[in-house]
Amino acid sequence: MKRKVLFTAPYMIPFVDRFKPVFDRYEIELIIPAVQERMEEEDLLKYAGKFDGAICGDDRYTARVIEACAPRLKVISKWGTGIDSIDAEACSRFEIKICRTLNAFTLPVADTVLGYMLAFARRQPWMDREMKNGKWEKIPGRSLSECALGVIGVGNIGKAVARRALAFDMKIYGNDIIQIEKVFIAETGIEMTDLQTLLSNSDFVSINCDLNPTSYHLMNSDTFALMKPNAVLINSARGPIVEEQALVDALQKGQIAGAALDVFEREPLPLDSPLLKMDNVMLAPHNSNSSPDAWEKVHWNTIKNLLDGLGIQYSYTDASTGSAQVSRTIRK
């Protein structure tokens, strides 16, 4: 009897023909619904009890979905790193394995943060806009070496952001709920401190932590009040870490100077969001993971994780291109 897999990862669906030889080799039938950004709870419930494994993006695997899909569902293989959209407690209760690719998008996300800092410091987007509107206006900028960076969440991405900041001779503050390795502190000169000190001393604040109960709405009216009036908030992690209305209020009141956002509390960002009309805000559609090399690695590791979770004994010497790629990924 063929195993069935609900295949809903938006970044993989366009290339599904590349992956089919692997699934055919192991007699896996794919269920591929139409997906825009993600599958919501009600969308997933339509397939409850009909699949053995899942390859997903940010689909809403709530406790209700997990309970409805058990006991048939054995593994959820997440494309990417973040698993905050999956109810881990419910999966544990029903013995459903959750898999992901750690350190998947460290480099492109860190590059994105650096790009935002340079844009706000050197003011290129704003000068370009003025020039194209027929205005010859010199907008004052600053060097990154004159700025301090606060990194909230000093994991893989936070460390990569700090290393980039070090190359620009920035003062770096860090905050994390776990102890950071002494060798990294010595390498970068990062000053690990409490959140209040970080916020009150940083010209740029980069959010690079996971979304969890300790970080939900970490940035709110109280924490925005601690920031410098010339400071810029950068969020390339998860939208709900920032209380969006509090951010809008802080920007409108001039409590902070600007924001660069790749993620939002609701995605896609509603068309009536005040953020869309703010000149001191840079926006992107959750795209900081964009990197052909990173995507390729994650595609195949997601498949490998699925096979592992289904208990499939895959061959390291399979002749097909797809399975050979899976084998190479497994060896890494």
Regions found by a protein language model. Give the residues of each.
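Phosphate/diphosphate ligand-binding glycine-rich loop within oxidoreductases
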Residues: 50-128, 142
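Oxidoreductase and adenylate-handling cofactor-binding alpha/beta cores
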Residues: 110-129, 163-170, 300-308
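C-terminal helix-to-coil terminal segments
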Residues: 2, 14, 18-19, 25, ...
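Short acidic/histidine-rich motifs immediately flanking catalytic phosphotransfer sites
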Residues: 48-53, 71-73, 201-204, 228-230
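Conserved acidic E/D residue at the C-terminus of a beta-strand in Rossmann-like folds
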Residues: 176
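N-terminal glycine-/charge-rich "phosphate-binding" loop or analogous flexible N-terminal tail
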Residues: 1-51, 328-332
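Rossmann-like adenosine-cofactor binding region
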Residues: 63-66, 179-274
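Glycine-rich NAD(P)-binding loop of Rossmann-like domains
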Residues: 126-160, 187
